[in-house]
Amino acid sequence: MSQNNLKFTEFLSNVKSKANSKGFMKLFDMYHRQVVVKKPFSFLVHIMCGLTLTSYVIRHDKVEHHKTQPYH
């Protein structure tokens, strides 16, 4: 596992633990199960969310400060 993947995995673990400690994750899971998954356009919504996240990651990697701080 590369250094970037390790840092990203640690980041996801930290976000999940913080969200669980505040109860946000339970609220999100409930919303996702009851609203997002059951609606007729749920597949389209998930694709749009994935594309949005992917485009954010790609744009973020092209930001100028990555030339001086490539790993953060």
Swiss-Prot record:
<dbReference type="GO" id="GO:0016020">
    <property type="term" value="C:membrane"/>
</dbReference>
<protein>
    <recommendedName>
        <fullName>Uncharacterized protein DDB_G0276837</fullName>
    </recommendedName>
</protein>
<keyword id="KW-0472">Membrane</keyword>
<keyword id="KW-1133">Transmembrane helix</keyword>
<feature type="transmembrane region" description="Helical">
    <location>
        <begin position="41"/>
        <end position="58"/>
    </location>
</feature>
<keyword id="KW-0812">Transmembrane</keyword>
